A protein has these predicted regions:
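Short extracytoplasmic
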Residues: 9-40
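Sec-exported extracytoplasmic/periplasmic mature domains
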Residues: 39-47
Length: 217
């Protein structure tokens, strides 16, 4: 039987912890990982987080750039030979307007539905998202709405060791990103998204966008 343990932290807080399989992840943690990726990837305001400086983005080479937050979020995606992190960054660069980097375009993702995780097998889950990306052209430009309906497949990975006190801000951010012990291993179109948002698009001129192409999903 799994044990329940009482733990008191050095700051005096008390927690009750339950013993779980090392591949177990709480459903809300899984959902929050997907939500975090989407918010960091698609919420652009042209400013480096925590500063008032313009976000010049991260250079991917060949004149391609992504926002700083999108670059950080990409570390939630599986990399290496079996991963598709670089491919996602390339696609994101293709749809990121250059005017984002001088503060003339802003973007916001509005998530209207995020499913409870469905376990595919031990340590792997799928989550469906129905969302709308809103591009705001400044000053006084026409706003554009773009449907973003996706199925995310995630798997449990090793939880990283805490960072030392002298670690850089980027190292600390990456640790926080990976501290849930999850990574995204597949992103595909959620075909059920239209049923979820039925009636939502009438008269809005919302268009579909497929940034995650079939050659690497």
């Amino acid at each position: 039987a799994r044990k329940t343990t009482f733990v008191q932290l050095v700051n005096g807080r008390a927690l009750v912890m339950s013993e779980q399989h090392y591949l177990y992840r709480h459903p809300e943690v899984i959902k929050n990982t997907v939500r975090q990726w989407a918010n960091l990837t698609f919420n652009w305001d042209g400013i480096i987080p925590g500063t008032k400086e313009l976000d010049k983005g991260r250079n991917l080479g060949k004149g391609k750039r992504v926002t700083t937050n999108a670059y950080i979020a990409s570390f939630l995606i599986q990399s290496g030979k079996s991963g598709f992190r670089n491919a996602v960054l390339e696609e994101l660069a293709d749809i990121t307007p250059a005017r984002v980097f001088n503060g003339q375009v802003r973007s916001k993702i509005i998530i209207s539905y995020l499913s409870s995780p469905r376990q595919v097998k031990m340590g792997e889950w799928e989550v469906e998202m129905v969302a709308t990306r809103v591009l705001v052209n400044l000053p006084g430009g026409v706003d554009e709405e773009i449907n973003f309906n996706r199925t995310f497949k995630l798997k449990a990975v090793d939880i990283p060791s805490p960072q030392s006190n002298d670690s850089s801000a980027l190292e600390q951010q990456l640790y926080e990103m990976r501290s849930a012990g999850l990574e995204i291993v597949k992103i595909s179109e959620f075909t059920g998204g239209e049923a979820v948002r039925e009636g939502e698009r009438e008269g809005k001129g919302v268009r579909e966008e497929k940034i995650i192409h079939s050659h690497f999903i």
